[in-house]
Amino acid sequence: MRRTVALAGIPNVGKSTVFNALTGSRQHTGNWSGKTVACAEGRLRGGGLTLTDLPGTYSLRAHSEEERAAREFLVSGQACAVVLVADAGCLERSLILALQVLEVQKNAILCLNLMDEAAKKGIEIDVAALERELGIPVIPCAARQGKGLHELEAAIRRSAAGENETHPTAIRYPAMDEDLTEEQRDDIATAAAALRAEEIALTCVRQPECACARDDRADDVILSRRFGVPLMLLLLAGVFYLTLFGANVPSEWLSTHLLALGTPFAGA
């Protein structure tokens, strides 16, 4: 019986790079049965396992054809394990999908890709803490540089053999009214997943102070009750001054110099 491992992730996290690095030239591309969504399959280096590259999707709860195809494949039980590919530089965004996948497939691995790019930005991730929070193995790697791929391949084989002990975290959903529509329920469920993803990211990710943090502090001052009104009045006074008096300076300068330019022609 063919054993299949699925690769899942949001767009632009390097999932295809990971897939190509793990399969090399032993792959082919086709369409999902009854769908126009492209799929790729390949044999893991060393043989014994088939990797299926699922369509990139931000959520399993949305309704695009790609998202339906990914969810149907995971729910069908065709995959004995799932590799969740995440962007180390934007971990929180990747975790929303990862948490949703863990609800339908417990046997999973998180591939923390693009670690090199995260390091350039000064982002540090506590891998051990992330493993504790998610309850699954986490493998840091940089697929484009070939770093961490041997460890990832070994983890995939252990997972496919059922040797990885996993205790996936659960999303805490609020109580929902029976009158809610399916779309409203999906929105609430996605918000709950986003909240859990934020909690995990705050625990495991350390980012350097950046321009956005400085902007937040500036907003706190400008929009505060103590300084906001005086700053607004000062700004309005400046605009009022420029409107009544400030405009005279450039207009007088232009008038003087333009008249001076026209003087030679006036005497001709």
What are these language model-derived features?
Residues 242-268:
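Interfacial/capping segments of alpha-helical transmembrane domains
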Residues 42-45, 69-139:
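Conserved C-terminal guanine-recognition region of P-loop GTPase G domains, centered on the G4
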Residues 184-206:
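Extended, hydrophilic extramembrane loops/domains of integral membrane proteins
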Residues 210, 214, 222-232:
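Membrane-interface helix starts
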Residues 232-241:
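Hydrophobic core segments of alpha-helical transmembrane domains in multi-pass membrane transport
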Residues 1-63, 76-77:
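Conserved G1/Walker A P-loop phosphate-binding module
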Residues 116-168:
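Canonical P-loop GTPase G-domain recognition
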Residues 202-216, 258-266:
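Short, membrane-interfacial amphipathic segments enriched in basic
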